[in-house]
Amino acid sequence: MSKTSRIILWCVLIVVLAMCIVLYAAAKRPAADTTYRDAGKTYAESLQPGDETPVITGGDFTITAHTFENMCTQNRASGMTETVAAQYTLARYIVTRSLYYQAVTDGYAAADAAVQQDIDDTRAAAQTADNREAYEQFIAGTGMTEDAYWASMFETRKLMLTLENYTQAQKAAFLAAGHAPDETDAWHDFCYTLTKAAVDAQNITLAAPYSWTLTRENYNDTGTWPELTQSTGTPG
């Protein structure tokens, strides 16, 4: 796994699949540790109403100050400076949302039934895991019922599964064009071209004082597709 992928897996765990923090950390923390409850509390706080001022505005989506700052907080907690955390958060939201809506437009949206099955499978695995106690502490920390927690994950999992569908289709197109599976640089060039087109189509505007532009130079450092779409239990 690349350095970029490892950073991604750490930075978006709570927002994308908060439970994974619990499952990963459980074997490494004493039972009395409040890590799991704290993680649950942080996740629940991210769902509460907050500052609705737009920070990122695209043709099909808006990221509010509340949502943006929640992600920045997680990035800073992973060791990023304030400036780097903000830039990384801009990159993540701009790229993932732009690609998601492009995927939907192109007909790759994950079916609701498939999303629900994915959630049901993940929930079943969590309930039978060796570290179930940690999972229970996390749920307790959210202040939500299990049903409510998993329901709250629906849109996030729909986004990730849609991106996985899109990635698989584009990988097939890449190979059909005569490329070999191990042509990593060519694959990244291919992905960058599609990503840039998707981002440009959104006509992104950012609130002051933020600025960020996708370039080929920063593409592989921003945690962007295709790394973010790998379905390994902790979506990129």
Where are these regions (language model features)?
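Short, low-structural-confidence N-terminal segments
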Residues: 1-82, 192-236
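Generic detector of bulky aromatic hydrophobic side chains
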Residues: 4-6, 96, 117-127, 166, ...
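N-terminal targeting/tethering segments
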Residues: 38-147
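Solvent-exposed, amphipathic alpha-helical "stalk/arm" or coiled-coil-like segments used as scaffolds
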Residues: 82-109, 136-216, 221
